[in-house]
């Protein structure tokens, strides 16, 4: 659980979060980034690429979700979608080359399919 620096020792509840942090797309993108990190891809370059892409996907989504401008939302969601595809490609390659477990790869792939559908709807 996230800790509030303003009130040390008190757990944040869903009511203490910004509205966009409660959305499924936010939670799924964050879980993808977490799983890429936990997967510990054995090749350092590919691990770095997958990690950066998954973080970029999450952060682009975070910039777009609270935006009130339709054009800016679309821009951020298109960028998040590109980073999501980069993440999936890096994970798929890592699994193919034996640099991470198929189990981790399958879990990330399943989450990516969910997020892809959400990003497509958010862009509209």
Predicted segments — roles?
Residues 1-124:
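Amphipathic alpha-helical assembly/interaction segments
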